[in-house]
């Protein structure tokens, strides 16, 4: 199965072998455990800056999605890409337009795709200009992509580099902010779980895996390349299919007691990050952001409850878009 990207060369998530391996390998250094660990101090600062702003208000209220969850991954991705924090509002607008617009919003969708392509095109062109003037290529994501090669020695095209950066932005923001928001929504609804994580912060990593399983944000679309049969179902070439990872995570043949949310679940072979060769390359980063975001929130805001209606996204990524809270 595969799916061509808009605007030229496909990014790694839609490449097929053998080029998929080359495209993925070029991105791996940015997402190793060691590379992600280097981002922890700044991620913790980002979380505390956001919490500082929340706690300076007089009304003891906050929207965990709007005030917190939506900002953390935007600023971490900006850090990873070496672009200003101030570009975050633009990033959020693009993500909402691309992942949550209906088919009737195609003009808005196409505009956001064009703006994103232009943004990263300028970023790549500027780096190429700097290198041509004698600067070092750099070891960040842009530098890694510009020095990457296919097995035959061919450099990645500029279009491929731009589309890979677009992928990192789309895949690394909405999914993570949805997961942070869902975790805080759960903890606002289940005070026993919240109290336990406050007193036993060592449980947070296990709780994160359970939140990822129970509230997995991603459903992936694919186009069938060849007639095939899967699970007794016939699929024809050219048909589109959806791979609902959230449904897999609630399959009793896959997970024991799938409808129970157990923050100390011992075995948790969830599929929130996908499976196989296209498994999410940024899972280490997402887990780190979730861990730090929950640690800092619970350390500084240990008691909170829902304070109004929660709204959820529609589209390919599912997550809470409004989580109004009363901070006790």
Q: What is the predicted function of each stretch?
A:
Residues 1-328:
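Cytochrome P450
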């Amino acid at each position: 199965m595969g799916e061509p990207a808009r605007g030229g060369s496909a990014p790694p998530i839609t490449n097929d072998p053998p080029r998929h391996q080359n495209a993925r390998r070029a991105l791996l250094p940015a997402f190793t455990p060691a590379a992600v660990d280097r981002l922890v101090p700044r991620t913790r600062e980002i979380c505390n800056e956001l919490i500082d702003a929340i706690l300076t208000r007089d009304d003891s209220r906050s929207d965990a999605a709007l005030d917190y969850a939506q900002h953390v991954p935007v600023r971490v991705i900006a850090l990873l890409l070496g672009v200003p924090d101030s570009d975050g509002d633009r990033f959020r607008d693009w993500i909402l337009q691309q992942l949550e617009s209906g088919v009737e919003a195609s003009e808005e969708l196409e505009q956001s795709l064009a703006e994103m392509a232009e943004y990263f095109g300028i970023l790549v062109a500027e780096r190429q200009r700097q290198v041509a003037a004698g600067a070092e290529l750099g070891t960040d994501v842009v530098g890694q992509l510009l020095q990457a090669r296919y097995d035959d020695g061919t450099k990645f095209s500029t279009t491929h580099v731009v589309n890979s950066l677009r992928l990192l932005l789309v895949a690394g923001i909405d999914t993570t902010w949805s997961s942070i928001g869902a975790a805080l929504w759960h903890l606002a609804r289940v005070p026993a779980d919240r109290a336990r994580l406050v007193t036993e912060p060592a449980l947070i990593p296990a709780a994160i895996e359970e939140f990822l399983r129970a509230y997995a944000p991603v459903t992936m679309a694919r186009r069938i390349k060849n007639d095939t049969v899967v699970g007794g179902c016939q699929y024809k070439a050219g048909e589109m299919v959806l791979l609902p990872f959230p449904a897999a995570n609630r399959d009793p043949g896959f997970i024991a007691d799938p409808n129970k949310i157990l923050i100390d679940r011992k075995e948790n072979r969830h599929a929130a990050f996908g499976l196989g060769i296209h498994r999410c390359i940024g899972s280490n980063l997402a887990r780190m952001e979730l861990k730090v975001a929950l640690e800092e929130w619970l350390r500084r805001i240990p008691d909170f409850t829902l304070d109004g209606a929660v709204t959820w996204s529609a589209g390919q990524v599912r997550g809470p878009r409004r989580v109004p809270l009363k901070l006790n």
